[in-house]
């Protein structure tokens, strides 16, 4: 199998994940309402992120340089899938702006309204919150807003044990 075929499969797998999220969200929203659907999915996605946190825990609570190398350096397709820009990396914080997101793109490609894409992005970003918080860092993300460029802007801060 060629590198291009593998790359296409990688991108297709992210699009598939996006569509599973979307369909699940639509079903839950129809049964429970948007707030409960988002909360339920967000908690499950957070837990999945937390399950993957061990690879970043050695850098907690405050080795943000090593965290940057491990996280950004480990992004799929050499980072091309998300087009990360490290905006800040110092003792006070790590900030990474994603200029692309395969989930967001998949939702836009099927014609979802931007407001719905933004809601799904907020839910999907819980994976990163789970990942970084369970690893021992403080974290928040600015997620996609209709009309804005790119997607998530991740803000990682030293964890509680760092003082």
Q: How would you label these PLM feature ranges?
A:
Residues 1-122, 130, 138-152, 157-163:
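N-terminal accessory segment detector
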């Amino acid at each position: 199998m060629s590198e291009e075929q593998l790359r296409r499969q990688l991108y297709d797998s992210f699009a598939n994940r996006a569509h599973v999220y979307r369909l699940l969200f639509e079903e839950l929203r129809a049964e429970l309402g948007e707030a409960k659907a988002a909360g339920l999915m967000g908690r499950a996605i957070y837990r999945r992120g937390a399950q993957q946190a061990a690879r970043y825990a050695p850098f907690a609570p405050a080795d943000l340089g090593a965290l940057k190398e491990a996280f950004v350096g480990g992004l799929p397709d050499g980072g091309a899938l998300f087009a990360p820009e490290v905006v800040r990396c110092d003792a006070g914080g790590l900030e990474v702006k994603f200029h692309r997101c395969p989930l967001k793109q998949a939702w836009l490609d099927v014609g979802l309204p931007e407001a719905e894409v933004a809601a799904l992005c907020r839910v999907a970003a819980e994976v990163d919150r789970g990942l970084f918080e369970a690893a021992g860092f403080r974290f928040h993300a600015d997620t996609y807003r209709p009309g804005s460029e790119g997607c998530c802007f991740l803000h990682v801060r030293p964890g509680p044990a760092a003082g």
